Curated annotation (Swiss-Prot):
PANTHER family: 50S RIBOSOMAL PROTEIN L15 (PTHR12934), LARGE RIBOSOMAL SUBUNIT PROTEIN UL15M (PTHR12934:SF11). One of its GO terms (biological process) is translation. GO terms for molecular function: rRNA binding; structural constituent of ribosome. Keywords: Ribonucleoprotein, Ribosomal protein, RNA-binding, rRNA-binding. GO terms for cellular component: cytosolic large ribosomal subunit. The lineage of its organism: Bacteria, Pseudomonadati, Pseudomonadota, Gammaproteobacteria, Aeromonadales. It comes from Aeromonas hydrophila subsp. hydrophila (strain ATCC 7966 / DSM 30187 / BCRC 13018 / CCUG 14551 / JCM 1027 / KCTC 2358 / NCIMB 9240 / NCTC 8049). This is Large ribosomal subunit protein uL15. Disulfide bonds: none annotated.
Length: 145
């Protein structure tokens, strides 16, 4: 056995396709690109999202509606079981931030009924749903507006 006589086993290496090199290759003439059109051209086929070939795009044909509430960027929901993470008896926006329940950019928070609360807390300066209010008061807590 010599290094110059080594060769891979028959059938173990696939022959690389060479498009556009004659009809016998199976990829002659059009080279597997089909006939005419944007994707058959060199550099073709890459168009931006929503582009419809010059036709008026659907996004522009439909009417505008609604808006994006900027208050939603500074508002958050707080669950009852997250209030348990706050140390102390008073729960407000600053204590929720210190406990890591809400992020620093939050200005408004609303307490919702999800989970349960087992200790008396005073909720100050937060919106509270009916169900959450009942659960907090049942645990001996109170809500201050």
């Amino acid at each position: 056995m010599r290094l110059n006589t080594l060769s891979p086993a028959a059938g173990s290496k696939r022959v690389k396709h060479r498009p556009g090199r004659g009809i016998g290759s199976g990829l002659g003439k059009t080279g597997g690109r089909g006939v005419k059109g944007q994707t058959s051209r060199s550099g073709g086929g890459k168009v931006r999202n929503g582009f419809e070939g010059g036709q008026m795009p659907l996004k522009i044909r439909l009417p505008k509606f609604g808006f994006f509430s900027r208050k939603s960027l500074v508002s958050a929901e707080v669950r009852l079981n997250e209030i348990a993470l706050v140390e102390g008896d008073v729960v407000d926006v600053s204590t929720l931030k210190q406990a890591g329940v809400i992020t620093k950019n939050i200005v408004f928070a609303k307490v919702v009924l999800s989970g349960n609360i087992d200790r008396a807390v005073t909720v100050r300066g937060l919106s509270v749903t009916k169900g959450a209010r009942a659960a907090i008061e049942a645990a001996g807590g109170k809500i201050e507006e």
